């Protein structure tokens, strides 16, 4: 397993180009299974989860290639089962189920793996597909869905806001007979992006981005070209990198309008922020950030995927900050690691109380999930001495060349291959 070796402290400064959003590219790639003609998807990040998805689509019989863009031709899909060996590394595989059953009347997906944060059952996906008329059984570790003829439109009320299940229902409903309404739908920008992609192929989806999405079923989807939205979490991570190191940054090829809650908290922490149509600049003017109070909630609230980075910000800020996690349980696994670097914090159930310290010290730490590991790498950039971050395969699942981008900002970071 690779490690990162980071030598600090560094004040990060410069420009970074933001990659496409993992959380939009994944559902869009799976939704390409619905199309009977070739699609071209631009701005897809280079990540392990993307590679796994492309491999999975290939195993289902799609032609998939990458040359700048990702090209998917699902016209000859003839296998309807997503096997355990690919699914086990990535929860997103469940997104194959809706498109398979909607277009081919059958689909099966092994129960998924992915980050070890909290309970993320597939129940809501299953509930949604059953409402659309699919018969679903769980056997031998697989979720198996079938339908006679086409799925039927339905009025579906989600009892919990779920990005994953909203994607599943919306994708499957594009080919259902009649109209589907999803109430209490997730409102994330990645949902909007997936809907825009499907509409490009001929779907009739309206209301994405609100809590009520309407899908008028169509008989088939064609081909098209689509560009994935920039990654708001990668953007936020690099903005925090500059903020905690008292530096400055310009993020290019991003979408400021997807980051309102994060930008508001960074301003509260004392950052000077300017925005343009596709760029954000942040300047700390050499000052230490001020502690902020953060409560995660579904979009447009403060994103859970930025919680670990703001934990770090509070741990090196002036004052005491409180962070409350309302989305996932067990999502403070980075905090004990940061305490080993000299941070001061107490965890009380779903809240972490952060007492800002003036400096952190390098240590050997372990990545536990995707966003937590990013915060450990940023901690290494600002800590005195050497930090070794172990198990960085988590980072490779969600950040496109993070070490290259940090190096361009002045970080002293290298990837150490296990055999060295």
UniProtKB/Swiss-Prot annotation:
Alphabetical list of CDD domains matching this protein: UdpNAET
SUPFAM superfamilies named in the record: EPT/RTPC-like
Catalysed transformations (reactions): phosphoenolpyruvate + UDP-N-acetyl-alpha-D-glucosamine = UDP-N-acetyl-3-O-(1-carboxyvinyl)-alpha-D-glucosamine + phosphate
Compartment(s) of residence: Cytoplasm
Positions of modified residues (2-(S-cysteinyl)pyruvic acid O-phosphothioketal): 115
Binding site for UDP-N-acetyl-alpha-D-glucosamine: 91, 120-124, 160-163, 305, 327
Keywords carried by this UniProt record: Cell cycle, Cell division, Cell shape, Cell wall biogenesis/degradation, Cytoplasm, Peptidoglycan synthesis, Pyruvate, Transferase
GO biological processes: cell division; cell wall organization; peptidoglycan biosynthetic process; regulation of cell shape; UDP-N-acetylgalactosamine biosynthetic process
Transmembrane region(s): none
GO cellular component terms listed in the entry, alphabetical order: cytoplasm
A GO molecular-function descriptor: UDP-N-acetylglucosamine 1-carboxyvinyltransferase activity
Metabolic or biological pathway: Cell wall biogenesis; peptidoglycan biosynthesis
Pfam families attached to this UniProt entry: EPSP_synthase
Residues annotated as the enzyme's active site: 115 (proton donor)
Residues at which phosphoenolpyruvate binds: 22-23
EC number: 2.5.1.7
HAMAP family: MurA (MF_00111)
Family under the similarity heading: Belongs to the EPSP synthase family. MurA subfamily.
Functional description taken from the UniProt entry: Cell wall formation. Adds enolpyruvyl to UDP-N-acetylglucosamine.
NCBIfam families the record matches: murA, PRK09369.1
Protein name in the entry: UDP-N-acetylglucosamine 1-carboxyvinyltransferase
Native source species: Pectobacterium carotovorum subsp. carotovorum (strain PC1)
Gene name in the database record: murA
